[in-house]
């Protein structure tokens, strides 16, 4: 039997759900902007002893530039124009296809960036755990999808507190009778008799989490139906473990898997397992296959059932450089625009110890093991007059990174082309590179720092 609509969602028409997204509390946002960061710090100006701390608000007011050489390097920066573009491109794509966008917070863990995505029209925020969910709340999210199982008692207690907030939509995943019963037993101890909305997670054989076969799926659905404090509002999956590129055979495997997800959802619906909303929720979709998800799991009428599709793409906002990760539906310009690389990493040439080799002051500690190759994009030569007007020039194809140590990069170049003190601007091939940085400046196209974001990965 269907119950009340999901909290935190207002219905504007029979065919569309819209978010009820509250803005971040002004006091919390003010605290974030006024928080003082100890200097010296990467990306902040060197203040020659005038102060030992600086806030993001002060940094934005000062507007130093990378060109002036007053900013401590290495520094990761966000291109402001790319940020606005990428948010707009994905939101337009979601709106055109009638899907609800819940960008994954794990990509940036930056409340200020999440708030911009919400302001642009995102339905809510996807997270991996309750810590990330709390960061999403700081961003002002009033619809939060925890794309994971939650089994720890402290975590469940936090969820119980959140479900008492009528303004917040909170959904979690369940993939087994065991995970359902852990939630139910903890909820049973709560005194208010509340309930938690859950999505049954489906998964492929050999994949990650998720119920694999009909027996496991049915057993999990029955366990949720038998629970007094759980309501099954839909299904969820992550198709990204089925394939890892956009070759034709990979896309065929993705399509086949998504067709199975749809058929399984319809079977559960016909069995009367869903409860908690007038419309079924189906959730999937990282950035790489979001177009396939929308085609195979298109929202609307599935037989006699109305379905809303929530896509959880995250890496679109920090779209990377290089061909290795550009195999997304947004690589070529289309009707919704084209994603553009967001992040640049700037560092100085520390040494030219032999012809054709320069050592740059950036390494694995700055980009992480997972960030993959860094790609030389720009060279800012060290001029005779450090205060003269200069602009970065495009890096030659002859500049390549041959290796990374913890704090050093090996830059191959034509002898005589690179000098000690030159600054190099790198692109990052993998978009998940913010986790090594507590504060990341935002720069305009002239590399003037106009703002900064704080990250909360831990």
Residues covered by each model-derived region:
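Glycine-rich tight-turn/loop motif centered on a GG-T
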Residues: 68-80, 143-146, 164-171, 246-255, ...
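Conserved, mostly hydrophobic/aromatic
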Residues: 83, 106, 136, 200, ...
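Active-site loop ensemble at the mouth of alpha/beta enzyme cores that anchors a bound cofactor
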Residues: 290-383
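Active-site-proximal beta-alpha core segment in soluble small-molecule metabolic enzymes
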Residues: 102-247
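Active-site loop/helix belt of alpha/beta enzymes
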Residues: 188, 197, 204-332
């Amino acid at each position: 039997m269907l119950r009340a609509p999901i909290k935190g969602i207002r219905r504007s028409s029979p065919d569309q759900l819209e978010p009820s997204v509250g803005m971040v509390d002004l006091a919390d946002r003010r605290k974030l902007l006024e928080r003082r960061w100890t200097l010296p710090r990467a990306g902040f100006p060197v203040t020659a002893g005038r102060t030992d701390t600086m806030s993001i608000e002060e940094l934005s007011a000062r507007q130093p530039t990378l060109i002036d050489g007053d900013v401590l390097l290495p520094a990761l920066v966000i291109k402001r124009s790319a940020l606005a573009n990428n948010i707009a491109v994905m939101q337009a794509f979601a709106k055109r296809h009638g899907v609800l966008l819940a960008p994954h917070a794990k990509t940036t863990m930056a409340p200020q960036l999440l708030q911009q995505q919400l302001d642009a029209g995102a339905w809510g925020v996807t997270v991996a755990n309750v810590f990330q969910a709390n960061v999403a709340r700081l961003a002002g999210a009033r619809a939060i999808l925890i794309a994971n199982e939650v089994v720890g008692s402290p975590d469940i207690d936090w969820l119980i507190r959140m479900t008492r907030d009528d303004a917040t939509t909170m959904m979690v995943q369940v993939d087994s009778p065991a995970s359902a019963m852990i939630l139910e037993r903890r909820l049973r101890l709560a005194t208010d008799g509340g309930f938690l909305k859950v999505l049954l997670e489906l998964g492929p054989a050999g994949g990650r989490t998720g119920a694999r076969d009909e027996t496991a799926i049915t057993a999990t659905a029955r366990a949720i139906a038998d629970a007094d404090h759980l309501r099954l509002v839909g299904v969820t999956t992550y198709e990204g473990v089925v394939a890892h590129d956009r070759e034709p055979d990979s896309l065929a495997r993705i399509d086949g898997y998504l067709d199975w997800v749809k058929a399984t959802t319809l079977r559960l619906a016909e069995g009367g397992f869903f409860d908690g909303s007038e419309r079924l929720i189906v959730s999937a979709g990282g950035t790489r296959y979001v177009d396939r998800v929308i085609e195979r799991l298109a929202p609307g009428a599935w037989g006699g059932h109305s379905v809303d599709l929530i896509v959880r793409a995250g890496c679109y906002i920090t779209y990377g450089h290089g061909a290795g990760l550009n195999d997304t539906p947004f690589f070529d310009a289309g009707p919704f625009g084209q994603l553009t690389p967001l992040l640049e990493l700037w560092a100085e040439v520390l040494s030219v110890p032999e012809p054709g080799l320069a050592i740059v002051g950036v390494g694995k500690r700055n980009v992480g093991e997972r960030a993959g190759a860094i790609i030389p994009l720009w060279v800012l030569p060290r001029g005779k007059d450090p205060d003269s007007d200069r602009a970065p020039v495009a890096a030659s194809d002859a500049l390549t990174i041959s290796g990374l140590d913890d704090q050093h990069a090996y830059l191959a170049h034509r002898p005589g082309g690179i000098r000690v003190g030159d600054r190099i601007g790198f692109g990052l091939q993998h978009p998940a590179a913010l986790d090594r940085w507590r504060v990341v400046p935002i720069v305009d196209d002239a590399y003037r720092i106009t703002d900064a974001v704080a990250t909360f990965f831990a």
